Amino acid sequence: MNQILKEKEQKTAKILVDRNPVPTSFEKWGVPGHFSRSLAKGPKTTTWIWNLHADVHDFDSHTSSLEDISRKIFSAHFGQLSLIFIWLSGMYFHGARFSNYTIWLSNPSLIKPSAQIVWPIVGQEILNADLGGGSQGIQITSGFFHLWRASGITNELELYVTALGGLFMAGLMAFGGWFHYHKAAPKLEWFQNVESMLNHHLAGLLGLGSLSWAGHQIHVSLPINKLLDAGVDPKTIPLPHEFILNRELMSQLYPSFEKGLWPFFSLNWGAYSDFLTFRGGLNPITGSLWMSDIAHHHLAISVLFIVAGHMYRTNWGIGHSIKEILDAHRGPLTGSGHRGLYEALTTSWHANLAINLALFGSLSIIVAHHMYAMPPYPYISIDYPTQLSLFTHHTWIGGFCIVGASAHGAIFMIRDYVPSQHYNNVLDRLIRHRDALISHLNWVCIFLGTHSFGLYIHNDTMRALGRSQDMFSDTAIQLQPIFAQWIQSLHTLAPANTAPNALATTSYVFGGEVVAVANKIAMMPMKLGTADFMVHHIHAFTIHVTLLILLKGVLFARNSRLIPDKANLGFRFPCDGPGRGGTCQVSSWDHVFLGLFWMYNCISVVIFHFSWKMQSDVWGTVSQNSLVSHVVGGNFSQSAITINGWLRDFLWAQASQVIQSYGSSISAYGLMFLAAHFIWAFSLMFLFSGRGYWQELIESIVWAHSKLKIAPTIQPRALSITQGRAVGAAHYLLGGIATTWAFFLSRAISIG
């Protein structure tokens, strides 16, 4: 009898949510700092507003309940998605209401995209450039037009409808965030059910997501793009639903549609090769990947992810258990291996976030390289300003995510790391030999720095002395990147053996022919030489220094020889109290702060290298006689081998457009260039300054106000050391990024 009762208990469905756990109270939310007892009392000094901003999203400081923290993060994700949908809706609405999309669609190789027209109020209509086809406006470089063309959007109505769909989804997400915190909040065990989460994300989001996108590409994008490529007027092309509902319409373009699903069920999948292809290379009409290749790709990865989504053990006792995998994962030199990591990852969101940010950041940088090497959207490869913008955008995103990974890794070490859980496992062993790790990494940084800059300084000296025959260059002492060249040739030759039916190489960056659209170069083989070898080692240097700072911040987050009780001081602290000299700037937060500057150095060199290399060796025109002429005539190989060359032939020569922009349609970038320099310089006031100086100044100003009986009730206080550094770093990065933005776009739009 007891056995039957037990079985019945097991069969009853688990209740995975709590009903109405937190009341919806606008009265409570109306109190600034309601999440903290001390902040809710209101401000006594100006420090209050800084603490309010520092702690408002630090859910760990609001409560110690892991369940409540998990719910807040989950709810915040819905809020984030809501904002993303509003933003996307705005992009589509601007495309529908204010853009020249349909004009651009008629001639994408000559007409420039715009989604904003400036109204003439104080003469700023000068910003409306002539974009071709009788349209005027501010040129945009987001790539949305190319994405819409690839999606099969042919008119403004479709953009309006999509914008409305985005608003509806934004509302749904906002409601979801409220509902899953206030009405039906998941229990902690739901958040910790990693196998179900993996199955859901792999099979649902990635698998079915890819499948639905493949379906859209096959039924909508392919036929519409085929007709557009053939020069059919967009106004006469049938609407998407007609292609979906009318099989005859599709079979005129792709004959295999007449056969329906029979080839699928009879395993004669080759019948579908008219719309699921494996061509390789680029479409010569659009300069982008073949749409049929892209559809095939999404169909293939959807199958892989749907299979992957059935790998983990949930209800039926079959499949993998993550805990079992981690606990069993032990090598001969790794002690107790990965034991303890499952417990860490199911109780620390910071640990999860650290891993995911590192992977996502790296992926973003990989995406940046794919966007130019394998351009996915029609005509995007000949829109040079857009290509430069997208590369820069994705590398910046990657850099910030990787620094964020270090920040949350350190927070995990301080707040969530339980030493007894990690005895002799891989993480414990990593921490125990951190001195060897950091000192060796430091040696690598010194080696890379001295040798890579040494090569440049040698070249500058030789050129200054007129001894060009003694320089490291392609025409004197060669330092050819032989491994990179070998990989290029390997990738050029491989498809003939590994994919015999492919028509071309994966990417023309490796080798092959020049692909030009409307006489503009979309992609061509990228020749690598001594200049690339040298700047590559600068990349290696800056990446390793960034890694040194960030890794040291994580590995020494809990303690060090200097401060054995660092974990008790928390994530951010200015110094280890008075009377302990030399203990400032040692908190994990300070490592993130320093890491941000090196990340900025690192990404700047990357985007400068990309911009100059593409203008010198890839971007340009092809004449009727098949003569290739590049934007800056191939000066990279001889100029990028000296520091003076970088300053004179890249920064100074290419800044001429932004400096001389006044009185033209790009004059806003000239103003932005100056304003961003100002913001950058303003940051130095915070970074080079002592707190005591400002406190002293404030007190004399307060004295003057008191004399005049106008002293404020909230006492002014100088920024703390940490706050000052945060403000300084923020303005330094904002100023630097906006300066680069103005410099790049004014240059790219002028040559584009």
From Swiss-Prot:
GO BP: photosynthesis
Topology within the bilayer: Multi-pass membrane protein
Residues of the signal peptide: none
Binding site for chlorophyll a: 685, 693
Catalytic activity: reduced [plastocyanin] + hnu + oxidized [2Fe-2S]-[ferredoxin] = oxidized [plastocyanin] + reduced [2Fe-2S]-[ferredoxin]
InterPro entries in UniProt: PSI_PsaA, PSI_PsaA/B, PSI_PsaA/B_CS, PSI_PsaA/B_sf
Cofactor stoichiometry and binding remark: P700 is a chlorophyll a/chlorophyll a' dimer, A0 is one or more chlorophyll a, A1 is one or both phylloquinones and FX is a shared 4Fe-4S iron-sulfur center.
GO MF assignments: 4 iron, 4 sulfur cluster binding; chlorophyll binding; electron transfer activity; magnesium ion binding; oxidoreductase activity
Transmembrane segments: 73-96, 159-182, 198-222, 294-312, 349-372, 388-414, 436-458, 533-551, 591-612, 666-688, 726-746
Subunit annotation: The PsaA/B heterodimer binds the P700 chlorophyll special pair and subsequent electron acceptors. PSI consists of a core antenna complex that captures photons, and an electron transfer chain that converts photonic excitation into a charge separation. The eukaryotic PSI reaction center is composed of at least 11 subunits.
Annotated NCBIfam families: psaA
Main function: PsaA and PsaB bind P700, the primary electron donor of photosystem I (PSI), as well as the electron acceptors A0, A1 and FX. PSI is a plastocyanin/cytochrome c6-ferredoxin oxidoreductase, converting photonic excitation into a charge separation, which transfers an electron from the donor P700 chlorophyll pair to the spectroscopically characterized acceptors A0, A1, FX, FA and FB in turn. Oxidized P700 is reduced on the lumenal side of the thylakoid membrane by plastocyanin or cytochrome c6.
This protein's name: Photosystem I P700 chlorophyll a apoprotein A1
Originating species: Cyanidium caldarium
Lineage: Eukaryota, Rhodophyta, Bangiophyceae, Cyanidiales, Cyanidiaceae
